[in-house]
């Protein structure tokens, strides 16, 4: 059985721990902080076998060197092949190596190219779990620091095509702020209203809203629904000074991301 556990880091990061029972060797996804990972390993008598990186930002990679030293430089470190990240031992690209097997894990791990937040961002799928870094968030998506709106839209559409029951393990607890924006854009979405209430209740109890699911995100995430009639109408109303005669899905997505950046 694959167990996935969250380690909280910084203000709102999640470092995901993957453990295939009964093995005591584990992998971590995007360890921006080594100290919290080491504390978790030692408290649970686990051995770190490797690291999976989605992109180069320091809050996702900052712990790699210390974890490698802690493990006496025996770690396998997987990450995107076209981003400059210190310590990667196994550079990955979905076209060249779409699937591979991790030691101590059952089944294949799939690599997806999902540029947008950064130019070389990748995501991982193992079993029914998606680790998407800062590409897809619950109720939102990552800012476009390096990629284009077209790249991000394509990446999100690729993720939205995964099986509906796929669990979405993003890297940040941004859900409430994302849902506040989503409700401004899509106020009559009952599924969104219900999810917002559940998310508020979870956060009041200091519980994570993650993982989400692909099915839920298809229903409530405005960035997966940029061509929805109510969302299009909201975009046109918000950007009323623009000519919307030929507003296609990419144009709507671009304006939606611009709106969120300044929300």
Curated annotation (Swiss-Prot):
Its cofactor is Zn(2+). Signal peptide: none annotated. Its EC number is 3.1.2.6. Zn(2+) 2 binds at residues 59-60, 134, 172. The keyword Transmembrane helix does not apply. InterPro entries: Clx_II_MBL (IPR035680), Glyoxalase_II_hydrolase (IPR050110), HAGH_C (IPR032282), Hydroxyacylglutathione_Hdrlase (IPR017782), Metallo-B-lactamas (IPR001279), RibonucZ/Hydroxyglut_hydro (IPR036866). One of its GO terms (biological process) is methylglyoxal catabolic process to D-lactate via S-lactoyl-glutathione. Pathway: Secondary metabolite metabolism; methylglyoxal degradation; (R)-lactate from methylglyoxal: step 2/2. GO terms for molecular function: hydroxyacylglutathione hydrolase activity; metal ion binding. Zn(2+) 1 binds at residues 55, 57, 117, 134. This is Hydroxyacylglutathione hydrolase. It comes from Shewanella baltica (strain OS185).
């Amino acid at each position: 059985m694959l167990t996935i556990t969250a380690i909280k880091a910084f203000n709102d990061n999640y470092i995901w721990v993957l453990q295939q029972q009964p093995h005591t060797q584990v992998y971590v996804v995007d360890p921006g902080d080594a100290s919290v990972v080491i504390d978790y390993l030692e408290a649970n008598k686990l051995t770190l076998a490797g690291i999976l990186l989605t992109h180069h930002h320091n809050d996702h990679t900052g712990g790699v060197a210390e974890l490698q030293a802690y493990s006496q430089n025996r770690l396998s470190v997987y990450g995107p092949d076209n981003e400059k990240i210190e310590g990667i031992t196994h550079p990955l690209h979905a076209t060249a190596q779409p699937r591979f097997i991790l030691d101590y894990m059952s089944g294949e791990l799939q690599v997806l190219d999902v540029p947008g937040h950064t130019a070389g961002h990748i995501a991982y799928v193992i079993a029914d779990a998606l680790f998407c870094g800062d590409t897809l968030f619950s109720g939102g998506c990552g800012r476009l620091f390096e990629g284009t709106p077209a790249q991000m839209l394509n990446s999100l559409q690729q993720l939205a095509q995964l099986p509906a029951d796929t669990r979405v393990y993003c890297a940040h607890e941004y859900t409430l702020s994302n849902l506040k924006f989503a409700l401004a854009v899509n106020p009559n979405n009952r599924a969104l209203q219900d999810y917002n209430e559940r998310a508020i209740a979870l956060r009041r109890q200091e519980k994570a809203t993650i993982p989400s699911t692909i099915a839920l995100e298809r229903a409530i995430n405005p960035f997966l629904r940029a061509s929805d009639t109510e969302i299009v109408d909201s975009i046109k109303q918000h950007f009323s000074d623009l000519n919307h005669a030929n507003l296609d899905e990419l144009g709507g997505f671009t304006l939606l991301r611009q709106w969120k950046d300044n929300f």
